[in-house]
């Protein structure tokens, strides 16, 4: 696909990332993707690793870059990929995280219970597809694993997808945990297709072993670090307390979007059938949560204020 240069992003980890004009450029500039600039990739891990300030937008661009490299590599090995398929799978990886909210897994445990970010991503992709007159139809097919060339879906969501290859290396870079610094270029070079499924050449087995080890170590040292987990539990407790107070009619400061979820019972059926849920969800980002916590830290309810002040001042529950 040679449509001219639409935009160039200078990013850590992979350097310059070129976004061609057309559909992919329109996706990157779309407010739903730009919203990811205001959502940190690793949530509350910055309490342990202060350098981990990178965003889901940066991750989406990095995954897009790796997808472009993977498509080029697979095509060079004789695997025929139409330009339309290449563009669609690039669109799918750009959009794979748009359903994340602030501190995504915290929200799934508190104010948006029972609705996963993957389901919300699909809802938002379908919404964008209507806006773009069906240009994302093929990307959605690939995302849902409904396209005959199954390896394209596996590049988006699989055991060796571009999502994992980017976030492990990116999170390793920003946290300084070197064990997660995988050789993504080497792994991509070893990819091939057999019977429409993604496979790895035998000489790439060592790289895959390193990848699996790196993933385990990153979960151990970063994603499930006891301090991060304790901080997350405090946030869950604060939001649940706020929701309890809201159910009793107590007036709480919150942005309109956050207030919608605090003062309404949202289960999967309501979320899927009430358009206001999605409209309010896409207005949420990290700023809504931190601003609310800052104000709640002086609330007259001692439980809410103690939890909120602890979040603001990093006075964290101790995990023994």
Predicted regions located by residue number:
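Histidine-centered, transition-metal-coordinating active-site segments
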Residues: 3-88, 102-108, 112-320
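Short alpha-helical catalytic segment bearing the HExxH-like zincin motif
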Residues: 89-94
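Short active-site segment of divalent metal-dependent hydrolases/proteases
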Residues: 95, 99-100
């Amino acid at each position: 696909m040679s449509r001219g240069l639409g935009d160039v992003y200078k990013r850590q980890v992979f350097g310059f990332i070129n976004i061609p004009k057309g559909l992919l450029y329109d996706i990157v500039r779309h407010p739903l993707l730009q919203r990811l600039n205001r959502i940190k990739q690793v949530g509350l891990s910055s309490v342990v690793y202060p350098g981990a300030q990178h965003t889901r937008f940066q991750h989406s661009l990095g995954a897009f870059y790796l997808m472009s490299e993977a498509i080029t590599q697979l095509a060079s090995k004789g695997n025929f990929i139409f330009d339309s398929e290449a563009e669609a799978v690039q669109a799918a990886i750009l959009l794979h995280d748009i359903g994340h909210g602030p501190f995504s897994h915290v929200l799934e445990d508190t104010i948006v219970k029972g609705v996963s970010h993957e389901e919300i991503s699909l809802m938002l992709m379908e919404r964008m597809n209507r806006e773009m007159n069906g240009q994302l139809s093929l990307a959605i097919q690939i995302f849902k694993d409904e396209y005959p060339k199954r390896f394209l879906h596996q590049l988006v969501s699989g055991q060796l997808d571009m999502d994992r290859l980017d976030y492990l290396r990116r999170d390793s870079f920003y946290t300084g945990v070197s064990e997660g610094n995988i050789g993504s270029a080497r792994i991509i070079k070893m990819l091939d297709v057999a019977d429409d499924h993604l496979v790895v050449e035998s000489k790439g087995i060592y790289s895959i072993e390193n990848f699996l080890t790196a993933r385990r170590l990153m979960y151990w040292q970063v994603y499930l670090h006891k301090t991060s987990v304790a901080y997350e539990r405090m946030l869950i407790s604060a939001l649940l307390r706020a929701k309890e107070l809201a159910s009793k009619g107590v007036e709480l400061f919150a942005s309109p979007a956050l207030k919608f979820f605090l003062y309404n019972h949202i289960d999967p059926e309501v979320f899927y059938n009430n358009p206001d849920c999605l409209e309010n969800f896409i207005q949420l980002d990290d700023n809504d949560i931190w601003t609310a916590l800052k104000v709640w830290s002086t609330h007259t309810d001692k439980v809410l204020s103690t939890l909120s002040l602890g979040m603001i001042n990093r006075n964290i529950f101790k995990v023994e």
